[in-house]
Amino acid sequence: MFSNNKYPANAQPPEGGCSFALCVLPFAFFLLFSACVEIEEYPNNPHGNFEALWKIMDEHYCFFEYKEVDWDKVHSDYSKRIDNNMNNESLFKLLDEMLQELKDGHVNLYTPFDVGRYWKWHEDFPPNFSADLIDIYLNKDYSISGGIRYKILDDNVGYMYYGDFSNGLGETNLDYIIDKMAICSGLIIDVRNNGGGLLSNAEKLAARFFNEKTLVGYLQHKTGKGHNDFSKPFPHYIELSTRLRYQKPVIVLTNRGCFSATNDFINSMRYAPNVRILGDRTGGGSGLPFNSEMPNGWMVRFSACPSFDADMQQIEFGIDPDISVELKNQDLQKGKDTLIETARALLVSKH
């Protein structure tokens, strides 16, 4: 009757890039301008492209030590399989297989004919989400503001679903939503299957649930070519919003489809007062993704800057909820979402 949907994470090709170079995008915590770190050139043949890709990752990928990946062994294993006579499709499959050794959803190989991706961070787990159920709860009388669908449920619990942090979100959008939800006994923020997007939108939303500037994590960047050549940790704060802020209990719903910017949003919300996280462990994805171009014009995206929580703990492999709840099949068949119903009961009992 109802489908327990899995949606793939966003896998759009990166914009920009500079030939044979690592393109470092502007990021406020350590750069005031964009830069490109030049790497040595390689011939445009299968061996040359293999060596170029391996070298890019060797010098710039940020999770080798944390994930205990022996990248030299990977080189030894895969270089034996490279043949200058292999066609593009065969080369792509081999290089993508090599990149999957990193088990990183932020690692993609972009070609004109396919996109290499690692999606096991959510495909190997129960989705705990159904888009059909969300449509039932929202019905037809919901509002839309800045990519957020929201309404007040019949027990006076506010509900909002934000499925993509790439969707525009302005301060005025949030003012309208929070003002409408002010009469509710509590608020459910559903970000299940949100594969990420703009960190600025994630932080803009999170800031509406803090009453003071709050440390939520740390960031580092590479300072050299070694696997452990990192800068000192830079503290990352959620700044106090001067706009309307929500003061009642909040429950954030999560599943394995919460990745990248959504993982960062969940991490921030853990430090907000009156907020609890309910559902399943998130999908992770805490490395800031940069991109580089290979000799043949293919593009590789990868995690280049690690981020941590406020205790300097890794969140690359996800964040556990405060309250673990799975979507029960018997509820699914009845048109009920176990996570939403559990959150509603908790919020009503607190009122």
Features from the language model and the residues they span:
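Flexible, low-complexity junctional segments that flank or bridge functional domains
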Residues: 35-222, 228-235, 249, 291, ...
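Bacterial Sec-dependent N-terminal signal peptides
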Residues: 1-43
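Low-complexity, intrinsically disordered regions enriched in charged/polar residues
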Residues: 26-27, 65-68, 72, 85, ...
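Low-complexity, compositionally biased segments
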Residues: 7-13, 61, 73, 312
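Intrinsic disorder/low-structure terminal segments
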Residues: 1, 17-19, 26-32, 62, ...
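C-terminal "post-core" interaction segments
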Residues: 37-40, 44-51, 89, 156-157, ...
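Alpha-helix termination/capping residues and helix-transition junctions
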Residues: 30, 181-183, 244
